[in-house]
Structures are given as structure tokens and as C-alpha cells.
Amino acid sequence: MLASPGAEGARRAIARMCHSGLDAPDLLGALAVAVREVVGYDGAVWATMDPASLLITGAHVEELPRESAPAFYENEYLHDDVNKLSRLARGLRPVATMSEATGGVLSRSRLHRELGLVFGFAGDNLRAAFVAGGSCWGAAALARRDPAAHFTQADVSFVASIGSHVAEGLRAAMLLGALSAPGRSPDDGEAPGLVVLDGDRIRAASASAEGWLEELAGDFGGRPGDRLPAAVLAVAGAAGRMVGDGEPPPSTRAVLRTRAGRWLGLHGLRLDSGSGEPEVAVILEAARPPELAAVVMSAYGLTARERDVAQQVISGASTAEAAAALHISPYTLQDHLKSIFDKVGVRSRAELAKEVFDRHYAAAAPLGGAPGR
């Protein structure tokens, strides 16, 4: 049940907003304002997510000091806590409050102790994963300052009611961005880059990394001269968790589109500095066709099995080879292909591959470059 008739009107307005063709930064900014009018909060992070790795790829921040960013990502990727975004994305309840998860004792949450209290947000925290078609395209973390101001079930219901619309809006933004991406010159940022981190700042970076970072700076989640963009911090945090406690996350790799319109792959890894203190580095490189295909296929609303079939087809497997690899009959595979073609709007395997690589990869890659190079 929503909080009020006014909340229902706001929900409908937000649904229309999510299907209006806004790009991701503008959509997140508009959502921050619209939701705040119904579900009061004092600070928030509205984020885009890579549906394959469930890592944050960009963020719109409301009223949170920039100094809180390292603590936010450290808690999300290095430490165990309640209501992790990745768990919400995989769970049956994609929206949850800290007060409910801790039985009303907020101090049981590390996020509350290490970030909330330190930066003046002593109240409740509401977190949401925005999921559509089984894929998570975004998330939100809403915080309150007043220790007595707990989020209500009506607040949770309202945010849950807009979740699929937000996910669809962010998914559409990714696809629409591919169509309006500018062309590139042959030499722009083609080589992989390496960034070595000291907390949330750069300790060392290769020359090629600077070009990639420039494409992220000024985009939502990164400002020129500011700390690292959200996507880099998220991947570094995930790699740090893998280093720190021996429990690797599902992936330390994320894919996103830069403000220049290119697909960027980020990969976090550990470097042995020889000093006894492990360092975290992030590789920045053009996204590879297989990982790009996974994101694009999710954006078209394909099921997990349909994505598996599409990957086989795009890689050039025959019907018999694809069916054998997926342990299904050729007839079942053909049924999946029919559904895939309908969703993507193509009529053949060749058109499917062309849709993914010509429209989403080659159009944003350096001129003359080849996928996978």
C-alpha cells in the first residue's frame, strides 16, 4: 500500500519520467527530486549498476560529503553488513531498511557506525535495487539524520512500486546512448591503462589510463580534479574485498559507457608492492565483445537462458554446437532463438550479431578498430 493518494500520483509521474528517454544522469537526478518529495531523506546515492557484475558504474549524490565516498564503497565491497546492494539485487525483496534489518538497533550496522554517525546521518537508511527482467540496472541508498526518523512500510512500498520502472528507464538509457554515441579518432584511448590507487586517490597511472579517466571525469560520478569516479571506486573496492578477506566477489569487472560514447571495461586486481601492504589497481580498457554482448542482451530483456543462447550464436556456434554446449535440444534452441529475434527486433543470426556489434560496439569503437582487439 502506498503512503497516500499523492504518493500514487507521484508514482505515475515517475513511471512516465522513466519512459521518457532521459539519459542516465538526468534520470537519476530527476528521480532524486521526485522521490524525496514522497519519501523524505537527507542524503542519498542514486547509482547505475553493471547487471553482469552488480558493481556501481556511476552515481548521483545528494547532500553527502565527498569525503564519505571511500567509506561508502569500502563498506559495500570490503565488509559484511546488512542490506548489501548485490544481495538486494539477487533477493526476493529488493527494497529494505536498516532499522528492520537490525531489529531497530542501528548500531549493529557497520555502515551506520563508520559512515552514518561520522558524517551526521544518525538515522535510518533505506536501500533499493532496481531490477527488470532479472537484471539489476541501478540502486539507491537513502539516509536520514534524525535517529528517531525510521523509514515506514509505506516508504518501502513506494520505492518498491517504482523499482521496475527505474530499471527499465536506466536500461533504455544505455541503449539510447549507443545510438547517439559520437565517432572516435583512431588513436583515442585504444591502449589499456593502469591506475594504482591509494584509497580514493591515484598514486600512479599510465599515460593511456589518463585518457580513459578523462572520459569519466565530468560525467556523473566523477568531476575534473576530484576523487576517482564511482565506477573506478566500486571496482577497486570489490578487488580490495577479494584481497582482504579471502572471499572473492562474483566479479571484479564492470562494463559501462563513457561520456564520449565508448564502452569501457574496468578490472580490479591486487598488486604485490613488496612492502607487505597489498595495493589495489584498476585496468581500464575497451570492453571486449563477450562482456559487451552480455550487457546489451540484458538490456533487450532477454532471460538468462536466452542470453546464453545469444552468446553461443554471436560466437559463431552452429545450432548443433550451441545446443550441445547448453545441454538442450536443437528444437528448444530454435524456440529460444525465435524469442530472441522478437525481443531484439531482428530476423536472423547475422542481424543479431550486427545489432550487437555494429550498433553497440563498432559505432563507439575507434575508427578502423576491430572488436576484441
Role assignments for model-derived ranges:
Residues 181-185, 286-304, 372-373:
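Regulatory hinge/linker segments at domain boundaries
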Residues 303, 316-351, 373:
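Recognition helix of helix-turn-helix DNA-binding domains
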Residues 167-188:
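Short, charged amphipathic alpha-helical "coupling" segments at sensory-output junctions
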Residues 1-164, 168, 172, 254:
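Regulatory input/activation interfaces that engage signals or partners
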Residues 189-256:
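PAS-family sensory domains
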Residues 349-360:
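Short, basic, alpha-helical segments at the C-terminal edge of helix-turn-helix-like DNA-binding modules
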Residues 305-309:
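The N-cap/first-turn positions of alpha helices
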Residues 234-288:
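PAS-family sensory/regulatory modules and their coupling/dimerization elements
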